[in-house]
Amino acid sequence: MASPSVSMSAPSSPLYHLDAARSDEQRRYMEELEAAGVCVFCPEHVATHHREPVEHAGRHWYVTKNDYPYEGAAAHYLVVSNLHVVSFDELPDEAGAELWAIKRTLKSQLEPTALATVERSGNMLYNGGSVAHLHVHLVALEKEPSATVRFRVSTNA
């Protein structure tokens, strides 16, 4: 299994937006990590604090399944920045090309009926995110037209 490695900036506080947790279990875990000052997505912590293994590690991103997948998703992957940043503006341009290549690869492997990409960049208190570390959700949708996957793009949703 691949393991990501890139040096990171010092994590900012807060690391987690607890009100964005989708379950009590997720909220409790985020509280524990926040108290310990651990960002679950920083490369040096992902192997010990994220349940799902890293399936691919690139120069700018690594890929893992979401520990808390969206209800109704056939598959839910996270493409996580190797750097502790919150915005795409903080990454070099070549990170975008690598992200697109990862998305194409996952789409060809999953062969979903449809694929939703959720990109929350910037302040998690406004974009509905739960972790202050840039990551992209790739959600493969069920083959049944009645299947619904909902995700939050605002804390007011």
What are these regions (language model features)?
Residues A2-A157:
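HIT superfamily nucleotide-processing domains
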